[in-house]
A protein has these predicted regions:
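Beta-propeller-forming repeat regions
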Residues: 1-208
């Protein structure tokens, strides 16, 4: 698939007690490809064949007790896409895709993907891209009615509603309540606070 191995991870995707192998291949200086292998038949079998990616995450987003795979990549126009692979009739298949705001360049450097929980307890992926260390944009991916959706993507603008100055903070459970919060820096009105880098407070938001 590629000229060299970039990364290797082990995950029990089908929860049968045997781990699958997720291999990131370095195709060239600008392109990575992800393959997923299983040994359930005693011989290596490729479940996902060399799909391009920048980041990926494994989680049980549809809460069926099995693990799914979300692959973040660029489409032919360079737009960010999240591909959702899940188990269907004992086959690991691409089920659906969702648009994300961040470009692959914004994800590859300071960007992060975090597994978390929405306000109603639904599992989700929090995808944060960083633009030139100045701005951060967060997309939230979750599964509704079997489809992967980006709950922060605006139907009007086509981008996430969660865009803020970058403060080196990322989504986390900041108050220990089991729900993942998204940081949003806000400038503090104060005397002398007129420079290019004003003092800011950090507001933390939950979503559902």
């Amino acid at each position: 698939t590629g000229t060299s191995i970039y990364s290797i991870a082990y995950e029990d995707l089908d929860q049968d007690g045997r781990k699958e192998l997720l291999v990131g291949w370095r195709v060239n200086t600008d392109l990575l490809a992800l393959s997923v292998y299983t040994l359930r038949s005693g011989e290596p079998e490729e479940l996902v064949q060399g799909t391009s990616y920048v980041k990926y995450a494994v989680n049980d987003l549809n809460q069926d007790g099995l693990w799914e795979l979300v692959v973040l990549r660029a489409d032919e126009e360079g737009n960010g896409i999240a591909d959702y692979y899940c188990w269907q009739e004992e086959e690991f298949q691409l089920r659906t895709s969702a648009r994300i705001t961040s470009t692959m360049a914004e994800l590859s450097q300071q960007g992060r993907v975090k597994s978390g929980v929405l306000q109603d307890g639904t599992p989700a992926l929090f995808v944060t891209g960083v633009e030139e260390s100045a701005w951060m944009v967060t997309d939230i991916l979750t599964v509704k009615n079997g489809e992967l959706v980006n709950i922060l993507l605006s139907d009007v603008t086509g981008v996430s509603s969660e865009i803020a100055p970058f403060s080196s903070l990322y989504p986390e459970d900041i108050n220990g309540d089991g729900i993942t919060e998204v940081p949003h820096p806000e400038p503090i009105p104060a005397w002398g606070n007129v420079g290019e880098d004003p003092c800011r407070r950090i507001d933390w938001y939950t979503y559902t």
